[in-house]
Every structure is written in structure tokens, then in C-alpha cells.
Amino acid sequence: MSLPADTLLWKIGKKWISPFIKKFYRLEFSGKIPEPPFLLICNHVSPIDPFFITPYIDVPISWVIAQISFQNPIERYFLKKIGAVQKFKSRPDPAMLYSIYNILNQGGVVGLFPEGTITWTGDFQDHLISPKSMNKLILSLNVPIVAACIQGAWLSHPVWADHGRKPKIFVDFNTFSDYSAMEFIHHSEWEWQKKHLISYPGKSKAQGIERVLWICPHCSSFRTLFGKRNEVICSSCHNHWLIDDFGFIGGKILPDLFHHQIEVFSKWVQDLGKASFPSVKVSIRNDRTTNLIKSFHQNLTIENDIIQIGSIPMNILKTKGLNTHFRDILE
């Protein structure tokens, strides 16, 4: 009897794509994998994280994927062919839970990224996880919990970057029966890099930096940073910082610069009282199906915990979830 997700596409990928991925990304693995069924959890550092897992696991995995990824017809076709499970973000999803239980009861393997979205800074995203809900899920399954910690993938190609670097990726596996599995995947690329100092050389390492850094760390000007080759440059004060082969920006780590700008931006919004962004592209989708209702350009303002899109007000405090999709879309 075949396992769930044991499809022709999986067989082709396992035989032909996995060896290429393992060689190209210079993957190194450690740890043992139990016999199925089991739940696989993993930190989320790259859009292609599943491809870093598959070469080491000899059984097909049914990955839990955000429902919006199924909106593209081509993407939907391939996701269905590999037995992916749809998940609505930031709300209870009984259908997803039923699918997980059903796959495990059939002796299959389910792959899950508890963070739900790729890290922009290289640090694990604790704020996106409900320990109570995750612990409840783990205890209800009565199967081994295999934890996979991916290291080096984010530094090989930061999600904000236009170009990747020469990759070197490590994946460690361990098996648990409780919430301690979550501690195993709690990974910071930067703490790991400080310890190992692995070189990730590449060209134009700074291009795309404006997606994640918008405030100059020297003069605090807004939207003046840009990447040119391997340097981050401020068009206002003309300071510049080199991104070296270890990923450090002027000797500093990205999370420190990122959190500093959040503090500066928060104070700026408070002092200003109102922040305005002209002609923002807005897409409104059905809450249940995520089908597109309408798309338009409109002015956007932020004032007193209210995001105002034209004449449409949204209370920030009532927002259930926040996510950046495909690097350019804020959900």
C-alpha cells in the first residue's frame, strides 16, 4: 500500500531533482529518521526549504502550505500532485487538522513550518507561534515528532536579496515526543554564524537590502538606503557599509539594524501623528477562499492605530495576522 503523497511527481523529484539539490547546495545531514508515521517540523528560512529536507528522507512528505499559494493555477497543479495540505493563516483551520490526522492515520508523513512564514532577519520568529496551540497539536497526534533544523540556507540566499551566494547548508534531525522539538528548531543564523564563521561569497550581495532596511543607521533618514554590488549606501548622508562573505553588514548583524530602525520608525510615526503612502496597490480577497474580489491603487495612511486605505479604515489592534508574501505583498 502506497503512502500519502507517494505520487509520480514525488518519485521523479526524489530520483532526479534531490541529487542535484544535494550537490548544488552542498547539503550535509545528521541524525536518524524513524519509520513513518511521524510529524516533521522545521524552521522556515527559504522558499525551497522542503527541497533541503527531501534528499535525506526516503518517504514522501505531505507539506502544509499556505492557501494563497494555491491561487496560482500552475502552482496549484504541482502542489496537488505532491499531496500538499492547504492551510489558512492566522485563524483556526479544522479542515487542515483533519487532513493532518488522516495522513498520519494512513501511515504517512506531514511536514509543517510552525513559523508559517520565512524569516526576514535570519532569526527564529517566536512571536508567530502559539506555544499552547502547538503543544496541544503535538500531544494529540500520538506519533513521533521529527525536528529538522536548517542552518546556512538563509545566509546562502537571504529572502530580501536579489542574488544568492555560494551555498553551504546543514540540516540536523532529531526525534522527540513533546514540545522540546520546538526548542530544537529555534535557530538564529547569526548566533550560528558567529560560532562557525562559514564563508558565503557572492556578487552583488547588497542588492535588495531596501526590502528589509528602510532607515539609515547613521542619519535616520527614511527610504534612502540602497544596495550597490556588495555595499549598502545611504543617498542622504553618503555613508556606506560593506556586506562581507560572512553576511555581516559593516561588522553588524542584520537583526540589530532591523530592530533599531523599528524603534526609530515607531518614534517617527508617534511624533508625526500620521504617515502617508501614496498610490499603494491594494487587493481585496475573500476571507474563506482568498479568491480575488477587486484590485486597485489608493492612498494609504497610518494614524492612531488605524490603517486607512482610501475611505476604508482598518483597526491595527484587531488584525489577526501579518505576513509578507513573495517578498512584495503584505497580507
What residue ranges belong to the model's regions?
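Phosphoinositide-binding peripheral membrane targeting modules
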Residues: R288-L330
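A cross-family acyltransferase "interaction/gating" segment
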Residues: V109, T121-S180, Y200-A206, E210-H218, ...
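Short Cys/His-rich micro-motifs in 6-15 aa windows
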Residues: H238-F246
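Catalytic core of membrane glycerolipid acyltransferases/transacylases, capturing the structured
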Residues: P34-R91, K252
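Short, non-ligating residues that shape and space the ligands of small metal-coordination modules
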Residues: R223-F226, I243-D244
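Helix-to-loop junction immediately C-terminal to a conserved catalytic motif
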Residues: L8-H44
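Active-site-proximal cofactor/substrate-binding loop regions of enzyme domains
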Residues: D49, E75, L79-F113, D126-S156
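Anionic N-terminal interaction surfaces
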Residues: I249-L300
